[in-house]
Amino acid sequence: MAVKIRLKRMGTKKKPFYRIVVADSRSPRDGRFIETIGTYDPVAEPAQVKIDEELALKWLQNGAKPSDTVRSLLSKQGILEKFHNLKYGK
């Protein structure tokens, strides 16, 4: 089972709100997911991002691949740098 960390769209028309979820790569964007690890609100000024760091690191260590957008959000939060340091022992 290929696992991805990606965005699940919520909210109303023209006012999107996203949950950052861990899901099987074969399931639809807003379909079945394994676990919710955070939220992303691009409409707020500035955009609000809340990610459970422990859960994100756990899933990254288990081999989950983040989507491009989630990768940039994780990077801005400093989580990818921590994952890199854990993986390569720095």
From Swiss-Prot:
Keywords: Ribonucleoprotein, Ribosomal protein
Domain of life: Bacteria
GO annotation (BP), single: translation
GO-annotated cellular components: cytoplasm; small ribosomal subunit
GO molecular function: structural constituent of ribosome
Ribonucleoprotein recorded as keyword: yes
Name of a matching Pfam family: Ribosomal_S16
NCBIfam families: S16
Family stated for the protein in its record: Belongs to the bacterial ribosomal protein bS16 family.
Name used for this protein in its record: Small ribosomal subunit protein bS16
